[in-house]
């Protein structure tokens, strides 16, 4: 385990699938005093970040309700998922369809939950207390297995569409949906309902504000404007320009053509930035647990006639010690120093890698007649490269 070996750790979503795994990661992170980061890229999408900036400035008033989802027809992807030879996949379903067949609940909650949890200051003044989940029967799921195996599917645990309702300690409500079965456009919902306005990302990125809330947003004044209709394009553009998130300004445009419209790059750049500058991460191990535990808690609810289930307090009582969700930033001088050191390190690493032919030596191990000798040659080159790199950095 990386944490047990002294390494800060980032885990792909969903990072934990049950309460035992959630608590195990928390206990280990606390024991080692190391970061455990959930790689939830949807928290860094442009609309979510801009809406977060608006929410933090009170544009929507008090956020009282939020919605998120992972609605994504996987029709074209089921057979592309890994087939684990040790998973007893006798029906050749590949891991993801097999997991849906064997497990009930929201199995992929964090894309929808993460961004709205930040807007609601979860673990920074509020926490989830109660959950109720409900699902449809697996109409599509059973037919899908029958189509792939040629046999009647008698047991399919996960419903085609799962809905989870959660209430917070401060009286807010969040609704999260999961559907990877039925044919419909991709949708993460992302809706914020506030006392002064409303934000909705799908099917089109929209905002609706009360006439009072419109004042001071920078949006052009329109007579008789109210929240019965969405803002027009001119107003929306002006609002988004004013609340264009600093992280999008710093990283977004550079990463625009990278993974998932740039949000992967922003997430990774932000993780590195926080580690380089010794800052709290945007998402910690407690967020990871809170967002991932829906899988098992939802199952408990649905397996007991959709009964209410109590959330564990993963923070051990510290959920209201920090006031409001915020991104941490280093002073400009420290930030510049850290960036310069990182660039120097990267340049030195690239130089010694080329000087000592490390990539070629590494690749040669796979095709070598004597792999042990090739590995030994590579290891010796790495030692020399590390010494040369240390010397180069010491001269900076």
List where the protein language model places each region.
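Short glycine/serine/proline-enriched coil/turn segments at secondary-structure junctions
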Residues: 74-76, 182-185
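Short, well-ordered coil/turn segments that N-cap beta-strands
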Residues: 7, 34-35, 62-64, 172-174
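Aromatic/hydrophobic pocket-lining residues that form π-stacking "cages" and hydrophobic walls in ligand
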Residues: 25, 51, 297
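Beta-strand-loop-alpha-helix segment that lines the small-molecule cofactor/substrate pocket
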Residues: 1-44, 58
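Predominantly a Rossmann-like dinucleotide-binding segment in NAD(P)-dependent oxidoreductases
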Residues: 35, 42-156, 271, 305
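C-terminal helical cap and adjacent loop that interface with cofactors, partners, or active-site loops
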Residues: 117, 185-193, 200-203, 210-396
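Active-site beta-strand termini and strand-to-loop segments that position acidic
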Residues: 164-170, 194
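A short catalytic or substrate-binding loop motif that flags glycine-/basic-rich loops and adjacent residues
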Residues: 110-111, 155-160, 168-169, 183-184
């Amino acid at each position: 385990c990386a944490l047990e070996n002294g390494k800060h750790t980032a885990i792909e979503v969903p990072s934990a699938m049950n309460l035992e795994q959630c608590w195990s990661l928390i206990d280990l992170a606390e024991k080692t005093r190391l970061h455990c980061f959930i790689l939830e890229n949807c928290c860094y999408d442009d609309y979510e970040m801009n809406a977060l900036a608006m929410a933090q400035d009170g544009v929507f008033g008090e956020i009282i309700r939020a919605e998120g989802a992972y609605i994504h027809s996987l029709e074209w992807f089921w057979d592309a998922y890994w087939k684990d030879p040790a998973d007893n996949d006798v029906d050749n379903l590949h891991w993801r369809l097999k997991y849906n067949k064997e497990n009930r609940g929201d199995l992929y909650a964090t894309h929808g939950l993460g961004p709205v949890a930040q807007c609601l200051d979860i673990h920074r003044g509020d926490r989830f207390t109660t959950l109720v989940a409900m699902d449809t029967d697996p109409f599509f799921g059973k037919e899908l297995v029958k189509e792939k195996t040629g046999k009647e599917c008698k047991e399919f645990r996960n419903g085609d569409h799962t809905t989870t309702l959660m209430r917070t300690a401060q009286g807010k409500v969040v609704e999260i949906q999961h559907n990877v079965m039925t044919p419909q456009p991709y949708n993460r919902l992302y809706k914020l309902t506030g006392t002064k306005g409303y934000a909705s990302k799908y099917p089109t990125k929209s905002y609706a504000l009360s006439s009072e809330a419109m004042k001071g947003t920078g949006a052009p004044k329109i007579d008789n404007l109210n929240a019965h209709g969405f803002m027009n394009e001119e107003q929306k553009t002006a609002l988004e320009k004013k609340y264009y998130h600093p992280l999008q300004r710093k990283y977004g445009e550079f990463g625009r053509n990278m993974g998932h419209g740039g949000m992967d790059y922003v997430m990774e750049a932000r993780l590195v930035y926080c580690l380089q500058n010794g800052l709290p991460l945007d998402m910690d191990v407690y967020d990871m647990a809170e967002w991932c535990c829906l899988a098992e808690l939802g199952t408990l609810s649905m397996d007991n006639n959709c009964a209410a289930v109590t959330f564990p307090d993963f923070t051990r009582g510290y959920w209201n010690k920090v006031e409001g969700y915020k991104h941490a930033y280093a002073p400009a001088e420290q930030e510049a120093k850290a960036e310069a050191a990182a660039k120097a390190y990267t340049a030195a690493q690239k130089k010694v890698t080329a000087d000592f032919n490390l990539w070629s030596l590494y690749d040669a191990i796979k095709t070598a007649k004597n792999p042990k000798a090739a590995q030994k040659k590579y290891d010796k080159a790495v030692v020399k490269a590390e010494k040369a790199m240390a010397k180069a950095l010491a001269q900076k």
